[in-house]
A protein has these predicted regions:
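Glycoside hydrolase catalytic-domain context in secreted enzymes
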Residues: 1-512, 519-528, 532-533, 556-837
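Short beta-strand elements
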Residues: 535-555
Length: 837
């Protein structure tokens, strides 16, 4: 996990940039060799002189050519690599480590604690599971964390005063020291190293029993940029070739035993392997008090934790960065009371999710010339032109499960393991909901939270709404997160009143097939206080007397331009899931794709000849003008200031080309407008750039941050990160990532916040606030519909309806941009073909 990867495409790109220079050097080299061969029969003195002259000429040509390349073609690239990078301030490092631990203290989620087993006093503890010695600290790709100096799980326990069984940890490190690599460039090794149960000798088990009565099992799952987690491990186990329409990612797997396969056909990466299942059986048959720690960002199937009475407690702890695993020791010992809440719905059987047939590898067949364009865009795609259908529409995550349960489509308890917004504490809270109050600032409600237990703790206050649904009309979920907040640390008996404010516009739905605008339909809106998406504490009714349409005369939520239908072209010929008649079309809508014919418009967009659009009457824009302007002159100027046109007229075509072509990890200098060069860097996990040669503290994953439900912590999180960026003279940050957890198999789920758009939006706004406070600008990403990593570079066509796009996938971006109307943020696009969005 600590390896920093260099993209092979970048290497090829640099080689292509200097290809002409390399050809010149190669010709000079061949000429030198030819001369040396020709003069081989000359007199010795003459031969030496000619050979020396030819070698000197070759050397001179090489030096001059490389200097030209460095001064012109590679000028900006070398500037990035060779310029002064600055050094990290130790105070900033110390602050980062503290913030990471603070975030993880609140971001670990306790989902089970039978008989209040936890906390326990620091004592000896047996920690089982290979991942206890090599946990997941982050993800791969842009979210890579340098784990070489990070606090591991065992060290985190020891720092809290626990003593761990070294006989077990020694066995695991001897079994394997390195974690298999899920690489963006070099393939994926999905192996889950685990010592087979048969290899635990009687001595090891008996020694463990003598060491402690308490056992912990650590299991991990990892993911990363460029690929999604396997839905079916069977083809990976047997090395099958990826075929059109199959639902698995490429990769390899090495079994832990020669006696059995770890997975059977049809089992997913998010189920227990046989070796893991055997380990759970072994531990639970020898210990009565077992703690399970799941170290992963993707919502794994954990129904089995209820099948063992020995499993007393379950803790969810995704990639924890440099110091986050201290939080496990803090929580288990009771030094910290867990207050994290889930940001996704966790299922007992993921194969029953509505998206399951519509994620993964799906390729069009009638691609012809488009395949040639795809190969040029990304050679490793092998000409694949792919697609993914967002068939569930707005019914993503809890929006589906809560609504489907209300409509009688599913049995909730049989389907859902942990609701969205769920998490346990060592104490209990009483929440009292006040009356709704309407004012010019919106609608407010006070919630008084009282700690009714005997341990200090924090509580998350969650407010949801259930809009009136008219059968066959605008699609609506029966449960929607409306607002939330987190209390301060409340001592036993202490109370705090939290005020939650929202607007009636927040409850409007986008009416794609009727008004073509946002609409707040008439009727009663149930505003409910809940402990999670499923369990209601109290509710109030808010009535809307008549339909309100947010059109040109009444724009929605501060829109500059009216929100109207703009994305018919993204909808495609897809049957989308509808609540009509109790989800009557569920089977049809959620079935696997049957149409693999590429849309004619997209085919044309991939094969057109741009010269067909040349027009001899077109006039060349003004370039290279002397208008007496510098970029600094327009600092703070509005977007519509006429001087921008004059400034652009001063730039040359070459400068414009270079500004775009050399835009990776920097924003180059432009001499004509006296623009200085500034540095950008990638990654939500902090400074970790092989391109720039700078490395800093590894921050915990964004899902840990989101599970805090604490926006103040999110501000502190990115502000601390921004201080390290500033030490390295970095100004732009390729983050935060705010795509949606559409499925549990998303390779970059660790890098995104949640399945919910509201929670994602609030956390994103907070992170942007922190990074702006540090003097930087973020590149919020990946706009838009970037929920799948498989085939992301293979002309991926994403199909979705406009209501889902606006209410689910656009919302984090929309709310963040609206929060910064002065333009302090940039946007990174996705790779898919829905760029017009």
């Amino acid at each position: 996990m600590g390896n920093v990867e260099v993209a092979w495409e970048d290497v090829i790109s640099v080689i292509n940039m200097v290809r002409t220079h390399l050809i010149i050097i190669a010709i000079a080299f061949i000429a030198m060799i030819a001369v040396m061969i020709i003069v081989r029969k000359k007199e010795k003195l003459i031969k030496r002189m000619i050979r020396f002259q030819s070698f000197f000429a070759f050397l001179l040509i090489t030096v001059v050519t490389l200097n030209v390349a460095a001064a012109e073609t590679l000028y900006n690239t070398l500037n990035v690599v060779l310029s002064d990078k600055g050094t990290l301030d130790q105070g900033h490092i110390d602050n980062s480590k503290k913030v990471i631990e603070d975030v993880t203290n609140e971001g670990v989620v306790m989902t089970k604690n039978d008989n209040s087993f936890l906390p326990i006093v620091p004592q000896k503890i047996n920690v089982f599971g290979w991942s206890s010695t090599n946990p997941v600290y982050g993800g791969t790709g842009s979210g890579t964390v340098d784990a070489t100096t990070a606090v591991g799980i065992l060290k985190g326990l020891e720092n809290a005063g626990f003593e761990t069984n070294s006989e077990l940890s020694d066995m695991y490190t001897e079994y394997r020291q390195d974690r298999p690599v899920i690489s963006i460039n070099d393939g994926q090794d999905w192996t889950l190293p685990e010592v087979p149960a048969a290899d635990y000798s009687d001595k090891i088990i008996n020694d463990a029993k003598d060491f402690s009565d308490v056992a912990m099992i650590v299991l991990s799952r990892t993911g990363g940029e460029g690929t999604d987690l396997p839905i079916d491990m069977g083809p990976i186990m047997d090395g099958s070739t990826m075929d059109i329409g199959t639902k698995y990612t490429k990769g390899t797997y090495t079994n832990n035993s020669k006696d059995y396969d770890d997975f059977e056909d049809g089992q997913s990466y998010l189920e227990l392997s046989k070796t893991e299942q055997d380990l759970v059986d072994l531990v639970c048959s020898n210990f009565d008090d077992v703690i399970v720690v799941y170290n992963g960002a993707n919502a794994m199937e954990l129904g089995w934790t209820n099948d063992y009475e020995q499993i007393k407690s379950v803790l969810l702890c995704a990639g924890a960065g440099a110091t986050g695993f201290n939080a496990l020791g803090n929580i288990i010992s009771g030094e910290v009371n867990p207050s994290g809440k889930t940001t996704d719905t966790w299922l007992k059987d993921i194969n029953k999710a509505p998206y399951i047939n519509n994620i993964g590898h799906f390729a069009y067949t009638n691609t012809d010339k488009v395949s040639d364009a795809a190969k040029k865009a990304w050679e490793r795609a092998d000409g694949i032109v792919s697609f993914v259908d967002y068939v569930e529409g707005i019914y993503v995550g809890y929006r589906f499960y809560e609504t489907a349960a209300d409509e009688g489509l599913i049995n909730y308890d049989d389907t859902v393991m942990y609701p969205f917004g769920y998490g346990l504490s060592y104490t209990t809270f009483d929440e009292t909901m006040g009356e709704l109050r309407a004012s010019d600032d919106g609608i407010s409600v006070d919630v008084t939270v009282t700690n009714t237990g005997d341990t200090a703790g924090k509580d998350v206050v969650e407010l949801y709404y259930d809009p009136p649904y008219y059968n066959g009309g605008i699609e609506k979920s029966s449960v929607n997160l409306l607002a939330f907040d987190k209390t301060d640390l409340l001592e036993p008996g202490e109370s705090e009143t939290v005020t939650l404010t929202f607007s009636d516009e927040d409850m409007a739905s986008y009416d794609t097939y009727g008004a073509g605008h946002y609409v707040l339909e008439h009727g009663d809106y149930d505003i409910s206080l809940r402990t999670d998406s499923h369990n209601v504490v109290d509710s109030k009714t808010y009535n809307v007397a008549e339909d309100i349409v947010y059109d040109e005369n009444n724009k929605h939520n501060g829109d500059v331009e009216v929100a109207d239908n703009k994305f018919d072209f993204v909808e495609g010929d897809i049957t989308y899931l509808s609540r009509k008649d109790g989800f009557a079309n569920y089977d049809t809508a959620t079935a696997a794709p049957t149409n693999f014919e590429l849309d004619g418009t997209i085919y044309g967009n991939g094969t057109y000849d741009p010269t067909d659009y040349d027009n001899d009457d077109d006039k060349m824009p003004t370039t290279g003008a002397d208008n007496g302007l510098e970029l600094f002159d327009l600092r703070g100027a509005s977007y519509d200031d006429d001087r921008w046109e004059d400034l652009l007229d001063e730039m040359t075509v070459d400068e414009m080309v270079d500004l775009i072509a050399f835009g990776g990890h920097q924003n180059i200098a432009v001499r004509s407008i006296d623009k200085i060069r500034i540095l950008d860097t990638d990654g939500p996990a902090g400074v970790n750039s092989s391109t720039l040669g700078i490395f800093g503290t590894g921050f915990c994953s964004e899902i840990i941050l989101a599970q805090t439900w604490n926006t103040e912590l999110a501000v502190a999180f990115s502000e601390a990160m921004g201080q390290e960026f500033a030490d390295y003279h970095v100004t732009g940050w390729y983050a935060p990532s705010m795509n949606i957890h559409r499925s549990a198999f998303g390779g970059r789920d660790f890098e995104y916040y949640s399945e919910d758009s509201k929670l994602s939006a609030e956390m994103a706004k907070a992170e942007v606030e922190g990074i702006v406070n540090a003097g930087m600008y973020p590149f919020i990403k990946h706009f838009v519909l970037n929920e799948q990593e498989i085939n992301r570079n293979a002309f991926l066509t994403t199909w979705s309806n406009e209501q889902a796009m606006r209410e689910i996938y656009f919302k984090p971006f929309e709310d963040t941009i609206k929060a910064y109307p002065d333009g302090k943020i940039a946007v990174m696009s996705s790779y898919n073909l829905d760029r017009k969005s």
